[in-house]
């Protein structure tokens, strides 16, 4: 049985990012006499600095939800699937768990003996 449905809807994943501004456009913004030195309260720059002062930096984890079959990046403080709210998540990028699993697998491979050895 094929997993692809040829008549089904196509999934289009596209990330549109604007390129960084050139140095010439940045210099014109700095030299503009009409601009004030402070940012407006609704500006994203001013809100970012306010958030940095009020919040501590939290680490993010990349996990997979076995119920929804999707990967999400979540805060390490409260990891819950945003879709189904499940707390059973697979953290497959955790370095310590990966190293321990790899070392255990390597040891079991070394212990196996074949008839020609």
UniProtKB/Swiss-Prot annotation:
What is the reported phenotype of gene knockout?
Answer: No visible phenotype under normal growth conditions, but the double mutant seedlings gir1 and gir2 exhibit excessive root hair formation.
What are the record's GO terms for cellular component? nucleus
Q: Which GO terms describe its biological process?
A: root hair cell development
Asked if the record carries the keyword Zinc-finger, the reply is no
Q: Which domain of life is it from?
A: Eukaryota
Q: What does this protein do?
A: Acts as a negative regulator of root hair development redundantly with GIR1. GIR1 and GIR2 may function as adapter proteins that associate with GL2 and participate in the control of root hair formation. GIR1 and GIR2 may function as adapter proteins that associate with TPL and participate in the repression of root gene expression.
Q: What is this protein called?
A: Protein GL2-INTERACTING REPRESSOR 2
Q: Which organism is it from?
A: Arabidopsis thaliana (Mouse-ear cress)
* UniProt motif EAR: location: 10-15
């Amino acid at each position: 049985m094929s997993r692809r449905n040829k008549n089904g809807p196509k999934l289009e994943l596209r990330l549109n990012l604007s390129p960084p501004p050139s140095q010439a456009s940045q210099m014109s913004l700095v030299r503009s006499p009409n601009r004030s030195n402070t940012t407006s309260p609704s500006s994203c720059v001013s809100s970012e600095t306010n958030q940095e002062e009020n919040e501590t930096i939290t680490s993010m984890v990349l996990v997979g939800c076995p119920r929804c079959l999707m990967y999400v990046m979540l805060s390490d403080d409260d990891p819950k699937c945003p879709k189904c709210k499940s707390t059973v998540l697979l953290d497959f990028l955790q370095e310590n768990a990966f190293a321990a699993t790899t070392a255990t697998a390597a040891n079991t491979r070394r212990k196996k003996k074949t008839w020609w050895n």
